Structures are given as C-alpha cells and as structure tokens.
C-alpha cells in the first residue's frame, strides 16, 4: 500500500513527476488526469515533529516568513535593526575593513524556537499534532495553489484510542483531501467508495465486487443493503481478515455475526480476496440457501 501511495504522490508533482511511467485515469469519463491537477504531500508524525526545528525548507518557516512579509510594519523593524547593526559595527575599534550581514526575515527564523510549557498538555503528542498539523497543511495548500492533497501514514502511531478519535477529527476538518494508510479502524472511511484494501497491489474493494455479491447472493438482499453492511463490517473486522479468522453466529470468535446478510457479505469478501477462514456456524440459525452457499 505504501508503494502505491508513493507512486500516487510522486505523480502529482510539478517537477520530477513519474507521469511518463504512471497513468492515472478518471473512471467517470476514462480520461487521463494531468499530473498538474493536484499536488501531493506525504506526512507522518515524524514529519510534523520535525517542523518544530524550523528548518529553512519547513512549511512552518515558509508560513512565518510569508505572514511577516504581509505585515507592513515588519519592514520598518528590520530597517531599524540594520541601522543599529551598522552603528554597532562603526563603534568597533580598529582599522580592519569589516562589514556586517544585513538582517532579514530568514535571520529572524534562525532566532526563533518553540517554547512549549511541558507542564501543560504540550508534553502529549496529540496536543502538538492538533496545534501544528492545520498550520502545516494550510501552508502546503498555499504552496500548491489550492490544489494540495495529503497522504498521512499511520496516524494512529503513538496515540491512544481517544486521541485517535481526536486526531481523526483534525484530519476531517482539513480543507483538502486526505488519504490515510492505517491499521486502526478509527481512521477508516465510513463510505464504501472511501475504503481501500489491497492484496498484491490490487484493489479488492470495487464496484465489481459489490455487483457480483448482489447478483450471486443466495438470499434476498438489496444492493444498497450489501453496500451499507459491508461498510460497517469492514471497518469493524478488517484487522482480523488476514489471520484465518473464525466466524461464528453463536459463540465468541474473531468475527461474530447473527444474521444471514452479514454472514454472506463477510464470506463473499473473504472468498473474493482468496483469504482463509474457518466457520463455526449453528446451521439451525441460518437459511437453507445460505447454508448451501457456505458449505457446498
């Protein structure tokens, strides 16, 4: 998955795009999407933490400089500082031909540092993320001329479940599209078309799967029901799909389902993905048609 996401990010770059070896197509009209349509950025918690260093290339530094440039009074302050520096140089004794570097906005950045009060919540990663991520993403979008999207890798790292929920809200509130690579259900999309599940670099959650599951269903079920229940079941059980889960309708197990529709959808998807599973089913609690599908 990370390989695919890197390809996606590298395609949508103004320079050094992989557009000559990668093609991205809009499935609505089957036209190729230009590499200039968006600008991709890759983020993780380490990237955000490194922003606190205020390096010359950091988004935080760029944003601070940009905001100072828009402040008319800043130029007057810098001119005053340079006059004082010239006076200081003139007061140096000796005849050496010394000069002094002009003070500018980049010099100000070098003098800045974060001074978090670690007796407060800033000692917690989630608080620093809440403070910095929106600022960094806002600057990314500005640099990309309002065409940015971000890929956030493993946003659950180092966060408790409650903190993951808080950070999910931060990502949801961003003004640009966000793609996450995650092992936590807290960050999964609640919409079928926002879910992704790859096996050997092949997307398994597709409209074709949805259509096939509908037409091949051994029970009476609407297509909308399949989509709705799949969204719920995938988010709930995605973490156990690849461990040969035990599926039961009457005992505690890796996957517990109590109705025919849920049982059919889960088994249909596992078969679609060629994933192994074990059934521990009370056949008296399911329809004969479903029983034939499961055990044939």
Spans of features found by a protein language model:
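The catalytic "switch" region of P-loop NTPases
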Residues: 146, 163, 169-239
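Glycine-rich P-loop/Walker A and Walker A-like loops and their local beta1-loop-alpha1 context
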Residues: 1-58, 271-296
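Conserved P-loop NTPase mechanochemical-coupling segment
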Residues: 63-130
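Conserved helicase/translocase P-loop NTPase motor core
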Residues: 110-163
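C-terminal alpha-helical "lid" subdomain
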Residues: 227-296
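Short, charged, amphipathic alpha-helix that recurs within catalytic cores of restriction-modification
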Residues: 153, 168-169
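A generic secondary-structure signal
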Residues: 7, 138-139, 169-170
């Amino acid at each position: 998955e990370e390989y695919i996401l890197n390809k996606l990010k590298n395609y949508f770059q103004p320079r050094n795009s992989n557009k000559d070896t990668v093609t991205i197509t809009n499935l609505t009209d089957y036209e190729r999407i230009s590499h200039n349509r968006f600008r991709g950025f890759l983020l993780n918690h380490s990237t955000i933490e490194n922003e606190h260093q205020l390096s010359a290339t950091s988004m935080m530094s760029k944003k601070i400089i940009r905001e100072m440039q828009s402040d008319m009074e800043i130029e007057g302050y810098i001119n005053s500082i340079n006059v004082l520096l010239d006076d200081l140089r003139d007061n140096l004794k000796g005849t050496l031909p010394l000069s002094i570097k002009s003070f500018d906005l980049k010099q100000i950045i070098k003098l800045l540092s974060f001074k978090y009060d670690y007796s407060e919540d800033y000692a917690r990663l989630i608080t620093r993320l809440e403070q910095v991520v929106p600022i960094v993403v806002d600057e990314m979008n500005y640099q990309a001329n309002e065409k940015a999207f971000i890929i956030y890798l493993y946003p659950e790292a180092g966060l408790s479940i409650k903190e993951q929920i808080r950070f999910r809200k931060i990502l949801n509130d961003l003004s640009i599209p966000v793609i996450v690579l995650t092992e936590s259900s807290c960050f999964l999309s609640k919409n079928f078309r926002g879910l992704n599940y790859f096996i050997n670099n092949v997307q398994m959650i597709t409209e074709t799967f949805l259509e096939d599951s509908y037409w091949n269903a051994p029970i009476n079920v609407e297509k909308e029901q399949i989509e709705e229940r799949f969204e719920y079941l995938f988010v709930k059980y995605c973490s156990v799909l690849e461990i040969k889960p035990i599926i039961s309708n009457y005992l505690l197990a890796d996957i517990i389902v109590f109705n025919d529709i849920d049982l059919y959808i889960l088994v249909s998807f596992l078969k679609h993905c060629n994933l192994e599973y074990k059934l521990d089913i009370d056949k008296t609690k399911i329809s004969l048609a479903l029983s034939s599908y499961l055990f044939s």
